Amino acid sequence: MAHNRITPLMNEQKKLLIAYYMPEYPVAGATLPVLEALQNSGADIIELGMPYSDPIGDGPVIQDAAQVAIRNGVHIGSLLDLVRKARAGEGCVKITVPIVLMGYCNPLIAYGGDCFLNDASEAGVDGLLIPDLPPEEAEDFLSRAKSFGLSVVFLISPVTQPERIRQIDALSTDFSYCLAVNATTGTGKLDEAERDADIESYLQRVSEHTRKKFVVGFGIRNRARVEKMCALADGAVVGTALLQAIAGAATPSQAASMAAGFWKTLR
């Protein structure tokens, strides 16, 4: 069974700052330099999007980034090749932080369930987040993922009931992922003050019904929001704002420089 880098990290008494990045965005060849920049700038975990033509929970920035990734040749096989290179230090410094893949069921089914789990594990992936995999239907997938040493992360939303929060906490291998707003990522449709009025009680409710760690994502754009979320949870995920920060890069090295510059503002 492959070594999993997430579990030891969960035992550390620290708040986690997690980066979400769409491979080969905004230009082909950007992935490995950007991963190096994020690791060097203090990302504790890197979440890589698996681009899909019909995402259900992604806002327009991530949807657009996925289309760019697809145009630049990203598919599951090429993404796993990039992870292998990152782990081997081919084209960048050796990437040692945990890597979680986030994507949807259909491409994984098309690839082949056990083939995907085996190839992901061998490439150096540590965890999976599959938004459209219902926890109550995930027993077999969880068992197979565990046999390949892969951590599985499930989502909690503001409308998730306490009993289901407990179920998700029990099923998530190492940590769960709380959506800070009940909307698609990065849309920011709710006023920040309105969100803040509800989010503290929501995360307190999650805390009361979980034993494992949980992190918060969706709409976190700056250090102030990171600090606020980390005061209420075990970590924060920043994705849309990172993609926006590097959107104007014309070369891989420029994308890496922009990623590093932005990420350092969050710490």
From Swiss-Prot:
Pfam families xref list: Trp_syntA
CDD domains in alphabetical order: Tryptophan_synthase_alpha
Molecular-function GO term, any one: tryptophan synthase activity
Pathway linked to the protein: Amino-acid biosynthesis; L-tryptophan biosynthesis; L-tryptophan from chorismate: step 5/5
Broad class of enzyme this protein falls into: lyase
Entry-linked InterPro entries: Aldolase_TIM, RibuloseP-bd_barrel, Trp_synthase_alpha_AS, Trp_synthase_suA
Catalytic activities: (1S,2R)-1-C-(indol-3-yl)glycerol 3-phosphate + L-serine = D-glyceraldehyde 3-phosphate + L-tryptophan + H2O
Active site: 47 (proton acceptor), 58 (proton acceptor)
EC number, UniProt record: 4.2.1.20
GO cellular component, one term: cytosol
Keywords for the protein's UniProt record, in alphabetical order: Amino-acid biosynthesis, Aromatic amino acid biosynthesis, Lyase, Tryptophan biosynthesis
Cited HAMAP family: Trp_synth_alpha
Family recorded in the similarity comment: Belongs to the TrpA family.
Subunit-structure text: Tetramer of two alpha and two beta chains.
Role this protein plays: The alpha subunit is responsible for the aldol cleavage of indoleglycerol phosphate to indole and glyceraldehyde 3-phosphate.
Record-linked PANTHER family: TRYPTOPHAN SYNTHASE ALPHA CHAIN, CHLOROPLASTIC, TRYPTOPHAN SYNTHASE, ALPHA CHAIN
Protein name: Tryptophan synthase alpha chain
Source organism: Prosthecochloris aestuarii (strain DSM 271 / SK 413)
